[in-house]
Amino acid sequence: DKNRIANDPAFQRTRENGSEFGRAGKGGKVIRNAIRVLLQNAKDKRVVSRLTKILVAVTKTDAVNERGLRTIEDGDMNTLLGFEFNINGKLGATLFAPYATAYDRVAGSVDLDIAAFAPTVRIAAPNGTTHFKIVMGASELDFANEASVFESSETAILPYNGADTAPIDLSVALTANSVLPVVQVAGVEFYQEVNGQMYPLKNGAFNALSVV
């Protein structure tokens, strides 16, 4: 029963796991709230549970705190690299243009650079796509206080054709000398032009967003 799980020494491991799972769940909410502006355009129905699962894995890499007290921020945040927020439109299966990311913790600057590329060659777009844009965001995550700072940048809506884009350089500024964990995300959003109006393609079902 509940009381026994809460107090019986035999359930010590269960309590420790539950404590860390709860922390991972709250941490997932911090991340989702932080990047909400971009996440609302690119997510699947299971993103909450998938994100919690990988944050449990991050927690397990914490070599500082004892079991049951391990935290996300003391774990290896690189475990999150490549996490896809929409399994129906993975960035890794969408954007094939080489890109470079950079984070200068002293200055607080976060960058995404993509050399000029031909969209129809380097982007695997869903049927019906006429236009797209590249988005990038970065967030300082204060898990202990369930707070965050978020900034984002994006290209204009660009034509999906065979002509090379201009080089893309997206940059945002976070707090200089921050001691908090920082997560950077990048994505592609698809559009369909109808009578001069831009509409999110299939309500964003195939938009991509990933931790980079």
Identify the function of each model-found stretch.
Residues 14-15, 47-49, 131-135, 155-157, ...:
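Short, low-complexity, polar/charged sequence segments that are solvent-exposed and flexible
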Residues 200-212:
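Low-complexity, polybasic segments enriched for Lys interleaved with small residues
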Residues 1-89:
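Long, polar/Ser/Thr-enriched low-complexity segments
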Residues 59-203:
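Charged linear interaction tracts used for macromolecular binding and regulation
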